[in-house]
A protein has these predicted regions:
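Pyridoxal 5′-phosphate
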Residues: 1-259
Length: 259
């Protein structure tokens, strides 16, 4: 699942003159594997193709630099690695895009177009002030802890979790052989056990996971897990190493009760 060189070569072949833009997920939301975005972005720059990055799983735990990548856009939600409220997010723009539609604004209602001064020209209507304030605090937390520190912490927990799960009978863990290519997301499945039922059983034991196809059927098809799905565990800056053995103990207990 994680072969950076093959990924780059496959994209090089697919990057024909007809391609108007290239959109990449920095980290797989299913398997946690990190794409070689530096090389992919370089190919886009060489061919003049806009590079767009989905940093949903990487913002706050991996370096994401707009200028360094030469990206046209980088999108990220606020409620994941930035520790903000749901309903918030950021869109980083390499250049100001031309407006498709314009409307009136509360600050200059007599005009039929947005004003040309900041911040009004970017803001219309009533804003999610509480969400923005919460996102700001999340950003301050990430800045204080350090992106590299958070990322290292999450990778260490993921390695610990992957090694522990792999020792359980009947458990198949989907992970990179190179820990540096794995973020804080890990998927697994249990032979002969429905992943939805397993997720619910763990949930009853206060282990929060997500089971199924994770809104990514093509990723599951590639991995050969489309029929079964997987159980996905993820870690954050607030998880500690002592939680991993408890998770594994609860899973082992469930497996021992399996008919």
């Amino acid at each position: 699942l994680c072969r950076p060189e093959e990924t780059v070569e496959a994209f090089r072949t697919a990057l024909t003159p007809e391609v108007p833009a290239a959109v990449f997920t920095h980290v797989s939301n299913v398997f946690g594997m990190i794409l070689p975005i530096q090389e992919l972005a370089r190919l886009c720059r060489e061919r003049g193709v806009p590079f767009i990055l989905d940093a949903s799983q990487s913002a706050g735990c991996l370096p994401v630099h707009l200028e360094e990548l030469g990206a046209a856009f980088i999108a990220m939600p606020g409620h994941k690695g930035l520790y903000g409220p749901q309903g918030t997010g950021l869109l980083l723009c390499g250049q100001t895009p031309p407006p498709l539609l314009e409307g009136g604004t509360g600050s200059e209602s007599i005009r039929q177009e947005m004003p040309d001064f900041l911040p009004d020209r970017l803001e219309a209507g009533t804003h999610n002030i509480t969400g923005i304030a919460g996102l700001l605090e999340g950003l301050r937390f990430v800045e204080k802890q350090g992106v590299q520190s958070i990322g290292s912490h999450e990778r260490a927990l993921t390695v610990q979790m992957g090694e522990s799960l792999a020792q359980l009978p009947g458990v198949e863990v989907f992970r990179s052989k190179d820990p540096s290519q794995q973020a804080g997301v890990l998927s697994f499945r249990v032979s002969g056990m429905d992943c939805e039922e397993l997720g619910e059983a763990l949930g009853r034991r206060d282990i929060a996971l997500r089971s199924g196809l994770h809104c990514a059927p093509l990723a599951h098809r590639t991995a050969g897990t489309l029929e079964t799905g997987t159980v996905r565990a993820s870690v954050s800056a607030f998880n500690v190493p002592q939680e991993i053995p408890r998770f594994v103990r609860e899973l082992r207990q469930i497996l021992s009760e399996k008919p």
